[in-house]
Regions:
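Primarily secretory-pathway and cell-envelope proteins
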Residues: 1-58, 83-146
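Tight coil/turn sites that cap or link beta-strands
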Residues: 63-65
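Short Pro-Gly-centered beta-turn/loop motif in secreted/extracellular proteins
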Residues: 69-77
Length: 146
């Protein structure tokens, strides 16, 4: 029978590396979206189209207290969703504990003209002077990753 160290190894939550793409269908553009996760939980951020909000076009894992820039986003309008939680389950493509689901209320509009392209910065944590509003969504409303 193993000691306490063996028990602790077994119950360590599973975490992917920041920047791990779970879905990557938005290649070929110039747009950029920097996402800062200043919260104490890991996140999976998802971009989907307003026409088909339940179908993820991009999904990337961002660890707690970390940030990541998604590059190469093609022109279009997208909704930004995110799930927060602990202990990622790669089979079910979801967090197993403390899971919450949210969506930014404003759509993101990416446009490229000549050498100019759209960049956004989104913070998942509240910031002083921040203008973006989020709203909770149910697991059923959240884009599926399976």
């Amino acid at each position: 029978i193993g000691g306490l160290e063996d028990v602790l190894k077994v119950i360590q939550p599973v975490r992917l590396s920041t920047g791990t793409f779970i879905v990557k269908k938005l290649r070929g553009g110039s747009g950029e979206l920097t996402i800062e996760n200043g919260l104490g939980l890991d996140a999976v951020t998802i971009l989907s189209s307003p026409e088909e909000p339940k179908i993820p076009l991009s999904a990337v894992y961002i660890r707690a207290k970390d940030s990541y820039t998604i590059r190469g986003i093609k022109d279009g309008t997208y909704i930004l969703y995110y799930a927060l939680g602990e202990d990622w389950d790669s089979c079910s493509q979801t967090f197993t504990t403390e899971t919450t689901y949210k969506r930014f209320e404003n759509e993101l509009h990416f446009r490229t003209t000549g050498s100019t392209y759209t960049t956004y910065k989104a913070t998942l944590h509240p910031v002083i002077g921040g203008t973006a509003e989020t709203e909770p969504v149910s697991e059923d409303e959240f884009p599926g990753l399976d």
